[in-house]
């Protein structure tokens, strides 16, 4: 008797466009490439302590409406220019969302938000949007969730994140070791920092792993290691943005032979999932920076045109410029917190 033992739970397999198809359709312009190169260099210098500005990764929790995102980007670019003496502002452009259980996984996975999962469409939309944002002079940041998607968009990312759910994953540490941009590792969902510290050391080393080429062929990838990695404090069972927590992290980093470079996420467990509390976290962090704390090299903020969030499940028409995932602060608060951070940096300089 013959047994069928393979693909028993696979309903359908569809061909994915090879990365080269989108790289040729939407090649990086000279402006876009220049934006990425300069932002990566600036972040590298901040991480090495050669630039005393603050890295600010700010933007929507997730991207679902390119039109609203372009408007947000245009506004943010104006602020980036105004505050460039104190802040290196990079827009958070997250196309993929890790879920605790189930839910909408982001624009690349389900661009039409109707469970049609037109991933080829999602990749096209994502690359074109990233290209437009970078071409305008605004650098972009994203979260990396798998080993394939970076081949479509990583050349347009100035900074990358590995999330709390994936920081402990060997695959993601290997991926980070080969990314061309600086990478931040979040502490674990329970608040432990050791997994992030271990991840930084692991990503700094060379690795050999499986991925795909730009032509979509399965490949063996050898990396040289990424020396531009750092920790992101996002809270856990309790917030971990206070001066006491920062001091503890500095000790942990020193024991691991790593520089005291810390990014603080104003959202997630640090704000107890209450978006308005990002302003309270920001006030505390500004106080630490103004007080001379140089280990805080960056912050992350969830912000959109309209504050709060909305449900995809309600069946109601979506509000323009409002998050469909985590709640964000609105534009007015965005301007306020960025100017406060810039003033804190000025004070830190003395």
Language model: regions and residue ranges:
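N- or domain-start disorder-to-order transition segments that initiate the globular core
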Residues: 9-48
